[in-house]
Amino acid sequence: MQVTQRWNREQAISLFNKPFFDLLFQAQQVHRKYFRLGQVQISTLLSIKTGNCAEDCKYCPQSSHYETKLDNEPLVQLPQVLAAAKKASDAGSTRFCIGAAWKKIHDRDMPLLEQIVTGVKAIGLETCMTLGILKPQQAQRLAKAGLDFYNHNLDTSPEFYHSIVTTRSYQDRLNTIENVRKAGIKICSGGIIGLGETISDRAGLLVELANLPEPPSSVPINMLVKVRGTPMFDNKDVDPFDLIRMIAVTRIMMPTSYVRLSAGREQMNEQTQAICFMAGANSIFYGRKLLTSSNPTEDSDKRLFRKLGMQIEKHTTIKNSNWKKKKLLLHDNQQHDNTISS
């Protein structure tokens, strides 16, 4: 179900400026209307190609433009990806996300990516990828393989964007999101706070997302993880109340989207995370590592969920017809193999 409203920046800013408890109350009302209280969706993120990225995103340690002492890693192959996906499934994740430090996907990598989607779905997980700029025909191929989600963040407002990135335009990002939408893949798109942006920039980001033809199915809200060697290492820390306000306004403006408390959780105490969940966050990344940054352990997340009385949401995705056919073929082949071996 999609609930859409055209937003303008003034309306969004007025939400940010609400008294804190009034804002929290409104966000909680919206959250209770469209989601089960106390349910959290769990994703696991794997980097299949780390570092040496041609982009100059000022927040990112994977950029080749900065000296961050990050160990570059080559492309991970299918068996290692599927082993990681199985481990994520066993730990309780319902979605497996694949990231690569690319500006764009090369056609030569498409067969591997298609095999990854098919293999991960055979494990029973939803699939998500974040691989940079995506051309229409590439989006269609990934959709045919069964890809559920594609992540492509807008990062910040259109006005502030070029202070952060110069190697990819804002329109490039919007074009990729449109290619994803037209291919029938669900959109995952959000942004980062702590880049030096203003309240107006945060409002502008959310207006862009909320006013897409279809708001994203999933909206990750990242808090800047400062890495020595990047231009943003000396940025001011994000005030926890600013993060909570960002979560709450996101929930109000995109009532049916999953709001993911994403990068930066390792720097948050349990109380901050709890209020973020109260403000409308209902998704997290699970596992010790997010691309290159640390993340709370599964055990610490489970302890927090127990304290809050929260439960992991069960996997309910309906697979597309192409995937159903592939699943039936896979099942038939397995039955045939069992007959031969018996």
Curated annotation (Swiss-Prot):
Reactions mediated catalytically: (4R,5S)-dethiobiotin + (sulfur carrier)-SH + 2 reduced [2Fe-2S]-[ferredoxin] + 2 S-adenosyl-L-methionine = (sulfur carrier)-H + biotin + 2 5'-deoxyadenosine + 2 L-methionine + 2 oxidized [2Fe-2S]-[ferredoxin]
The UniProt record lists the keyword Phosphoprotein: no
Record-linked InterPro entries: Aldolase_TIM, BATS_dom, Biotin_synth/BioAB, Biotin_synthase, Elp3/MiaA/NifB-like_rSAM, rSAM
HAMAP family associated with the record: BioB
Family membership: Belongs to the radical SAM superfamily. Biotin synthase family.
PANTHER family listed in its UniProt record: BIOTIN SYNTHASE, BIOTIN SYNTHASE, MITOCHONDRIAL
Name of this chain's protein: Biotin synthase
